Every structure is written in C-alpha cells, then in structure tokens.
Amino acid sequence: MTEEATTHRRRFLGRMFGAAAAAGLSMAGTATRAAAQDAGADDWIKEVKGTHKCLFDFPTHNNGMPLLHIFNFLNTYTTAYKTAAGQAGAVGTLYSAGQKSSIPLGFNDAIWTKYEIGAYLGLKDAAGKPYTRNVFNSPTPNDLHLLLGALNSPNIPALSGVMPAMAIPSLQKMGTKFILCNNALGLWCLELEARGKGKAADIDKELRANLLPGVTIVPAMVIAIEKAQEAGIRYNRQ
C-alpha cells in the first residue's frame, strides 16, 4: 500500500469513527453532559487512594483475568509488602465494544438478563448455559472454569476461593476504582441497536440507569488514561 493510500485510509477511518463517536455522544443528552461537567470529568482520580497506585488497562474481559491481576496487585501489597490498608489503589478500565469487550462488566444483572450479555460474550456457567447475571460482579467458586478457560488449564480446585475475592465489589472495597468510557458506551449502544436490541437512544438511557454502584462514566478512556498518568498513577496494560 502506497503512503498516499495509507493516508487516505487513515482519514477515512478517522471520519467514520468520529461520526460514530459523535452519534454516541449525542445520545447522552444535555442533562447528562451538564451533570458530568458539574461533577468534574476527572474527579474520579481523587477516589484512587494510596501511595502505590496503578491503572489496569483492559478493553477486553478475557474471562476475568484482568480482575484477577488487580486482586493480585492489591493483595500482594497487603500480604507480602505489609502495606497498610488504603495505601495501595487501583483503577480498572471498562470500554471498547464487541463480543470481547470489557464494557458489559459495568452493568447489573438486569442488563445482563435483558440483553443476554452472557450469550453475547460467549460466557457460560458450569452447566453450559449462558450467564444471565453479571458473573464478574458476583462470582462464586463454581465460576472458576472461566479463569481456567482463559489459561486453557484443567480444573484446579485449590483456586476456587479466588473467584469471590476478585468480584468487582470486593475489589472496590480493597481500593479499586472502575471507570467506563462514554464514547465506547455510545458505540456499544449503536452496536446493540444494529443487533436488534432496540433504539440506541433508549438503550443508552437504560444502561446509564443500571450501572454498578461506584462505576464512573468518563468522557473518553484515552483521556482518562492520560489524566491518570499525569496524576502519578502507574500504567499496566492487560
């Protein structure tokens, strides 16, 4: 491909993504944008406590492996480094779109049931049925096969106890802040509309009303990652 052709392709993709992002942003509504501005787009950074802080960047869910890595980070500081409570903090990023994305992790069981998120992500319970609940919000020892599947590993019963420990609420209590990309949310709503799940604007409104507690929507993940580094939060790509 010539340099001229490459440049043309980049411009085309840029315009296409820009149009999609703009459409997604428009669905947020004036009230939502105003509320976000009043609250401060970067106020979430203040919720990341401690002297040891790291952002875990995971656009894909990878069967929950990024959550395990966050747990490992926080737990190791406590157990091996004897760090006092509140001295280690983490950030988890929920964004992207498509059937491997991490963005569905930010929503409650009602959304997972209505939009058949388990089937959408290709995640099945121990009985082989698609999950109808957000398994990453309330995992049990019986969900260990998800992690082991990501590792292509046979069953290791001794690891089953880690599943409840890496639940989103558990990680939040340990010092993790989860953020969700507004631009990616708009794109995902358009995707769900294309899949016949309803009108994108209606989907957007419902998703925002069913966020997990403590999850904050940020204007753009690419900016949030930059802002985190400016604030001294380390970066870990998953």
Walk through the language-model features, giving the residues of each:
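Glycine-rich, aromatic-bearing surface loops/beta-hairpins
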Residues: 180, 192-238
